[in-house]
């Protein structure tokens, strides 16, 4: 017979909540997710507000702040109830599960038991429409959580699909389509026709969703449609909406950079900043626009543009102190564009090499430094060495793929003096 403690432990493990889901809990990712969640507008019309607070509570717990965790879990409860205009419902199952786990870790087993009982009562009163499936509210929250953690987008889309099949919901429909879009992110021709048509239908059903509208514009542009006028019309709407990462500004700026011009993208980002000069999210978006413009080789940057790019990156690094590695790498690359900035670029790289980085972040650093050595220092041998260091790290990412691609190109040409070493290296390189 199991003891009371064993029974409690088994009941906790059986819960559907953030504490039991298989999430990537690297500290650097937790910090990035926390900052990304802070950049989402928390106005009362945000249907994800309860989910956002739930996730922020879990992240704060994993980062060591139990008090903040409880505060956010309680805010999630309130947000769910206000949004649904009800004191209880299946949307609270994950939230109560989180609170059961938190009180268990705090040593308050009676309170943990109380929340377990609440979960049991909700599951009994609001069973899933399908005995073989989780409740659609749970699938939707699980999908949203994985999406925030940059998880498997195909799995995210599957969870949303399961939720929608049991409980049609316009917001879930929109996010299902976005998940399908993210899953096809690296396709040069855009979405498959069936997903594209689904996106068109959902966008017509959810016309106020500017984030979805901007992504739809991206896909239409990739299909060869002329979208300049619509992009400018959408920009007016985005500028008038609450500031946040769901406003549609990020994908819209991508459309501007790709299909209109880098300079107009900068103008749009600067206009947004003029309206809200203290918003760190807008500074982050503007910094990226300047970085892309500075790196455009066919049109040299003016000193004033370089100065603005540097100052924005410096601000963003200060505003995101725990999740600014990529911005530091971008700043180093911007410095490297001018002769006077070479020493500053090298200083940033060397400081990063001395800092503690998780393997995945170290991989990104090696890849960036390899490109810096090749393009700015013309040190091709050392550049290849750093590409090999990036490829060695057993983490599948864009940066690993890029480094391997560079090495394969050298191997296939067969003319570089390191060709034999690279051929042996690639032949013995294990897959993650």
Short names for language-model regions:
Residues 20-37, 62-81, 107-124, 149-157, ...:
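Helix-turn-helix repeat elements of alpha-solenoid scaffolds
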Residues 64, 81-85, 105-108, 117, ...:
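Short amphipathic alpha-helices and their capping/turn residues within compact interaction modules
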Residues 37-45, 79-90, 122-135, 169, ...:
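Flexible helix-coil transition and linker loops at the boundaries of alpha-helical arrays
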Residues 43, 48-51, 90-94, 136, ...:
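Start-of-helix signal in alpha-solenoid helical-repeat scaffolds, especially tetratricopeptide repeats
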Residues 2-13, 30-33, 192-196, 203-204, ...:
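Eukaryotic alpha-helical solenoid repeat scaffolds
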Residues 13, 48-55, 62, 91, ...:
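"A position-specific structural signal for the A-helix of alpha-solenoid helical repeats
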Residues 122, 126-245:
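Solenoidal tandem-repeat scaffolds enriched in leucines and small polar residues
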Residues 1-83, 98-113, 117-118, 123, ...:
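N-terminal alpha-helical interaction modules that lie
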């Amino acid at each position: 017979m199991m003891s009371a403690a064993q029974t409690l432990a088994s009941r906790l493990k059986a819960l559907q909540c953030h504490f039991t889901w298989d999430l990537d809990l690297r500290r650097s990712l937790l910090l990035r997710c926390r900052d990304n969640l802070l950049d989402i507008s928390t106005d009362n019309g945000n249907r994800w507000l309860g989910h956002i607070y739930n996730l922020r509570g879990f992240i704060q717990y994993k980062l060591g702040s139990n008090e903040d965790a409880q505060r956010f879990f309680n805010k999630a409860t309130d947000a769910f109830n206000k949004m649904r205009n009800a004191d209880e419902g299946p949307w609270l199952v994950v939230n109560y599960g989180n609170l059961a786990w938190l009180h268990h870790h705090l040593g308050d087993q009676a309170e943990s038991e109380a929340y377990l009982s609440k979960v049991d009562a909700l599951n009994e009163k609001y069973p899933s429409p399908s005995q073989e499936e989780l409740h659609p509210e749970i699938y939707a929250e699980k999908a949203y959580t994985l999406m925030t953690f940059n998880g498997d987008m195909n799995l995210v889309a599957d969870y949303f699909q399961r939720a929608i099949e049991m409980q049609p919901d316009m917001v879930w429909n929109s996010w299902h389509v976005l998940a399908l879009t993210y899953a096809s992110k690296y396709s040069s021709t855009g979405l498959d026709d069936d997903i594209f048509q689904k996106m068109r239908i959902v966008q017509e059903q959810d016309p106020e969703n500017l984030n979805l509208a901007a992504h739809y514009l991206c896909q239409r542009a990739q299909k060869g449609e002329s979208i300049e006028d619509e992009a400018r019309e959408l920009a007016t709407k985005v500028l008038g909406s609450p500031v946040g990462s769901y406003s549609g500004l990020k994908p819209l700026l991508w459309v501007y950079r790709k299909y209109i011009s880098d300079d107009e993208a900068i103008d749009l980002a600067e206009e947004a900043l003029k309206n809200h000069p203290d918003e760190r999210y807008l500074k982050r978006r503007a910094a990226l626009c300047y970085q892309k413009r500075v790196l455009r080789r066919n049109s040299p940057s003016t000193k004033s543009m370089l100065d603005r790019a540097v100052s924005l990156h410096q601000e963003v690094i200060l505003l995101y102190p725990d999740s600014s590695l990529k911005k530091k790498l971008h700043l180093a690359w911007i410095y490297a564009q001018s002769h006077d900035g070479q020493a500053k670029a090298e200083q940033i790289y060397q400081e990063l090499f001395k800092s503690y980085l998780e393997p995945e972040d170290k991989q990104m650093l090696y890849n960036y430094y390899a490109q810096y050595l090749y393009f700015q220092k013309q040190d091709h041998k050392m550049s290849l060495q750093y590409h090999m260091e990036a490829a060695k790290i057993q983490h599948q990412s864009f940066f690993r793929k890029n480094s391997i691609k560079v090495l394969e190109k050298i191997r296939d040409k067969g003319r570089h003096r390191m060709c034999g070493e690279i051929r042996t290296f690639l032949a013995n390189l294990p897959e993650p």
